[in-house]
Amino acid sequence: MSESVHTNPSLYSKGMLAVICAQFLSAFGDNALLFATLALMKQLYYPEWSQPVLQMLFVGAYILFAPFVGQFADSFAKGRVMMVANGLKLLGAGCICFGVNPFIGYTLVGIGAAAYSPAKYGILGELTTGDKLVKANGLMESSTIAAILLGSMAGGILADWHVLAALIVCALVYGGAVVANLWIPRLPAARPGQSWRFKPMTHSFFSACRTLWRNGETRFSLMGTSLFWGAGVTLRFLLVIWVPVALGITSNAMPTYLNAMVAVGIVLGAGAAAKLVTLETVSRCMPAGILIGIAVIAFAVQQSLLPAFGLLLLLGVFGGFFIVPLNALLQERGKHSVGAGNAIAVQNLGENVAMLLMLGLYSLAVSVGVPPVAVGIGFGAVFAVAIAALWVWGRRK
């Protein structure tokens, strides 16, 4: 294994390809494991209300460990941090395979995912820089979306065949991610020697929050990415109740196909952003953010399948074009102020809090009887207005 302390000028260096491969396997395992675990819970007659609790534990791990995972990523070689995090995921999947309570096993996977995220994004800024960082983010997002698509389908298909076999495959995939991490060059720690006592660590994290919030560019990025991912999770749940009402289709598979169209669009949009947007022209992505909300409104009133597929594909393109430059901006600016690991940890906190808040508002709307079509229209309108307000505010600052 080679060791390097310099940024490699090539976008397709061995280290970068190892990062992308490890990310694909890790994200594939996350999504396959979710569906395999849900199938296990169904087989064991867990109540239906327990299924979203599984996802809440996963998201909750990000929020609970946010003050610590950024420093963890910046205190050691990020490739090794990624390996340890994938090892935790492997342990969690193994626990579920051996009959440990699935909530415990999946919580371990969530902790691993929380530790993994700052390192996987932070290392991009150490392996490449400048405009190539935007392209590297495009590769990362594209591999992630591909893993979400394939992992979700694989988890469901394998679980229909044999639940335990599906869980074992998930564990093996995490094992493959650990092996892929071995090929990532051992870069020097970004910020070694920091205190590991609880109070200094939390103080350091919230100090990083203040630093990033006071900077106009990083505040702009944090708010944009939080809105995007909060909306993305909400849309996934909205599709489940919208399909039977708007299209008259009761198949469980149809919402999955529609989600797949969004994912394909994100890959296309991420590729376009890598070619058309630089760190100096990040504001070009903002119209795409507004168009996401408009596309949701147009989608919500559809009653035919083909236009619905087309609009969700377009929505995904806008989403990919919107999110990739904002991620790159935060990594580049955060690397020089609080460290890339801390910057991504702060970003994760914002995004996961946004997910919980938006899902809470969505659940409230559904619980009081708001029709799914009206929920979609209101959701799209609020998102478009929020992004427009963020754009105007950012230009004034």
From Swiss-Prot:
Domain of life: Bacteria
Record-linked CDD domains: MFS_MefA_like
GO cellular component, one term: plasma membrane
Gene3D superfamilies hit by this protein: MFS general substrate transporter like domains
InterPro entries on file: LysoPLipid__transptr_LplT (IPR023727), MFS (IPR011701), MFS_trans_sf (IPR036259)
Main localization (coarse): membrane
Signal sequence bounds: none
Annotated keywords: Cell inner membrane, Cell membrane, Lipid transport, Membrane, Transmembrane, Transmembrane helix, Transport
Compartments it resides in: Cell inner membrane
GO molecular function: lysophospholipid:sodium symporter activity
Membrane topology: Multi-pass membrane protein
Protein task: Catalyzes the facilitated diffusion of 2-acyl-glycero-3-phosphoethanolamine (2-acyl-GPE) into the cell.
Sequence similarity: Belongs to the major facilitator superfamily. LplT (TC 2.A.1.42) family.
Name the record gives this protein: Lysophospholipid transporter LplT
Record lineage: Bacteria, Pseudomonadati, Pseudomonadota, Gammaproteobacteria, Enterobacterales
Name of the gene this protein is made from: lplT
